[in-house]
Amino acid sequence: YLVQNGICPRVLAMDVNEGPLARAKEHIREAGLSAYIETRLSDGLSAMKWVEEAGADGGTGADGETLHGEVFRGEALRGEVLRKSRPEADTLLMAGIGGRLAARILENGAQKLFRMRTVIVQPQSELQLVRRTLNRLGYRIEAEDMVKEDGKFYTAILARNVRMAGSGEDGSSMADAVDI
């Protein structure tokens, strides 16, 4: 949907289980979107790579190995790698998982989330836990809406990184980028 409607030029689809990932890959191939959507086996955000920030002036490389396993818990980020690299995605979309799992993924991926602009999450349970986790990690909830899927209602939450509040790289407002 995101690629087909020009909302997102590139998507990284990740899942911890091979079966759902294989089915997703088949749907992507059938839709002719393999050039735009990459799939990876991943526990949370662990398979999301770090890329060198545009304009970085050398220094420590952004190979991902340097940061692997570190956990950010609200303190100031340390090290040249963190200042000169970013995760390969600027938006995280999570749907179809419970709130406890969503909160765990957010907590375990906190260092990458520190450099991402937007989180969209549709937890199937424990909304308060997800809201508190987003808040603790420096995200402000900007919108919530009910979504009906297969006869069930779910809450979709749009949250923005307060450290990057207000604009995209081109200076445009992020408010128009996602309509939940």
Predicted regions and their residues:
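Conserved SAM-binding motif I beta-strand of class I
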Residues: 10-15
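Conserved SAM/SAH-binding beta-strand->alpha-helix loop
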Residues: 17-19
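Active-site segment flanking the S-adenosylmethionine/decSAM binding pocket
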Residues: 51-54, 85-110
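Conserved SAM-binding loop of SAM-dependent methyltransferases across substrates and taxa
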Residues: 1-8
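Conserved acidic residues
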Residues: 9, 90-91, 117
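Class I S-adenosyl-L-methionine
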Residues: 100-180
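S-adenosyl-L-methionine
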Residues: 25-55, 71-86
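Long, compositionally biased low-complexity repeat segments characteristic
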Residues: 52-67
